Amino acid sequence: MTSPEAVDIPFEPKKILAQLPHMPGVYRYYDTAGAVLYVGKARDLKKRVSSYFTKTQLSPRIAMMVTRIARIETTVTRSEAEALLLENNLIKALAPRYNILFRDDKSYPYLKLTAHRFPRMAYYRGSVDKQNQYFGPFPSAWAVRESIQILQRVFQLRTCEDSVFNNRTRPCLLHQIGRCTAPCVGAISADDYAIDVSNAARFLLGRQSEVMKELEQKMHAFAAELKFEQAAAVRNQMSSLATVLHQQAIEVGSDSDVDILAVVAQGGRVCVNLAMVRGGRHLGDKAYFPAHVESALTLAEGGLGDEADGADGADEAAAALPGEPADEAAAARDAASAASSASSASVEAEVLDAFIAQHYLGNRVPPVLVVSHAPASRDLLELLSEQAGHKVSLVRQPQGQRRAWLSMAEQNARLALARLLSEQGSQQARTRALAETLSFECDDLAMLRIECFDISHTMGEATQASCVVYHHHKMQSGEYRRYNITGITPGDDYAAMRQVLTRRYEKMVEQAAQAAAADDAAGIDGESTRQAEASSLLPNIVLIDGGKGQVEIARQVFTELGLDTSMLVGVAKGEGRKVGLETLVFADGRTPLELGKESAALMLVAQIRDEAHRFAITGMRAKRAKARQTSRLEELEGVGAKRRQRLLARFGGLRGVVAASVEELASVEGISHALAEQIYKQLH
């Protein structure tokens, strides 16, 4: 790995490029502030990195990136496959400004069958283990819940928590309506229930005909033994399964597990539509919109063009280093241009490469990927197969049912992209309307940063404050923050608002002051990059959910911190808290403003204010529920933190502990029979 160049030393690419090896690896570009600009992988580091400094027709955006490079770091790997894996990990961890980025969505839902004697089926998100059975992943929560409803109707598996299952004395409502066989009260044997679980698992794996055939044999066997009630029950089960299969006839194909990936570029944005087929059933799709894909624009619109992140072959053709003979450098550039034209790697292929790497590496991969475009990287498929432990096939021109699925995915991608572009236009119009209403001047409205605060509590209990952020014409959920409010009189919203504003902005003001002091000491005139970064953390507009009282508190805090009070805007609720009746209250003495129901500016204010309220109240409820759940157990004599944790884990919560018998309490590790009796008496 090359040693990082110090930021204060002038960047000299010739010296750095001369030291790079002809080996596979990963390279990283940094700017003067130490921020990562780009992460890439190469079959030949020397040729790949050199191409950025020898090409004569870089797209405007890549050319701008090159001018910002102040430091280069490289990591040598044993193979290009290792470089690809390291590149993917670094892109996810560092989120470089010039890489194509997808939101790291690791929370795909699964349908879980637990390892219980009477397995429970449940909706599940998170990492999977080997103890339980997991089916999926599914594209949405709706797809999981629909599958659970189907299994309830056909196989009648239980869905109740173990703590409920262990404490039932009579069947629940689901048994009465034919959605559960009530194993909790012994209405079905463990062997018969295991058969239902096996059939349900095979159904999820796409072996429906096999299940139907076994059920038919079972029905005839019962009839031959004159067990007509059991035969009728199996017949009803077959009827339910046949109904489900008929309803899903359009969705079911011969494939078991397939993912369909359709990429569409339009209007400067790209959409990747991922459709999932599991067990032969089409489970729906999900649209992804990557960031940093300005190459979706044409060159005339300021995009990257195809050469920005082209295949290694094109870049390696331009391998002439600075200082080589001019004719050789020119020949290399001509070769690079020809290679780039020959490869003509589209933005769709680049985006597909990025999606496959970021979505599948390290996660489950189905055996077949049906794609709308051929990926640019050949090594990616080999690496996926190696990591998955099975061959992963890529189908570019599908036939039959797969072709219909791909066509549907492409259509859904176009619709999702059109909807996004429409919403973006509407949101940008709202941002512009708000800026005009508040007489706020901003050269780039996308950089307008709005923060909104709300206080939530229940009669003074579990007081929490929320801060939500609106930036780049959308809510930035990753920048949301909750603040636990302590040391105030319960129910004092003014004190809570003072505390959260002080905690939020005091540190930002200190950072800006430190940056300015450091620049003064260094003799830097004007605003340096360090000062600009510190100042960029401060919002342009601060919305306060409240009227004159809350705005006055905010004004006092901002005055104490030396901040501009003109950015403070209170949102006073109208009659009945209806949208359209709000009044904007200003901290700098401007006349309160009523905008009316049709105001685009007010729609944006209401959107941000409602999001702050939602974020605050969900946090407050979670905090309150946690406090109420644990407080009663904390009062139990003889029960410390470890025993309390074991009780909650064993019975699933306070309600399960209260419902447990003395014998069940005594079965928990660390709790004797005498202590169990004491706990039982204290809870009843």
From Swiss-Prot:
UniProt entry keywords in alphabetical sequence: Cytoplasm, DNA damage, DNA excision, DNA repair, Excision nuclease, SOS response
UniProt-listed InterPro entries: GIY-YIG_endonuc, GIY-YIG_endonuc_sf, GIY-YIG_UvrC_Cho, Hlx-hairpin-Hlx_DNA-bd_motif, RuvA_2-like, UVR_dom, UVR_dom_sf, UvrABC_protein_C
Residue runs in coiled coils: none
SMART domains per record: GIYc (SM00465), HhH1 (SM00278)
GO cellular component, as recorded: cytoplasm; excinuclease repair complex
Subcellular locations according to the entry: Cytoplasm
PROSITE patterns named among the record's database cross-references: GIY_YIG (PS50164), UVR (PS50151), UVRC (PS50165)
Superkingdom of origin: Bacteria
Presence of keyword Cytoplasm: yes
One record GO biological process: nucleotide-excision repair
Keyword presence, Transport: no
Domain GIY-YIG: 22-100
Domain UVR stretches: 209-244
Molecular-function GO term, any one: excinuclease ABC activity
Subunit and partners: Interacts with UvrB in an incision complex.
HAMAP family to which the protein is assigned, alphabetical: UvrC
Function of the molecule: The UvrABC repair system catalyzes the recognition and processing of DNA lesions. UvrC both incises the 5' and 3' sides of the lesion. The N-terminal half is responsible for the 3' incision and the C-terminal half is responsible for the 5' incision.
Family: Belongs to the UvrC family.
Name assigned to this protein: UvrABC system protein C
Lineage of the species this protein comes from: Bacteria, Pseudomonadati, Pseudomonadota, Betaproteobacteria, Burkholderiales
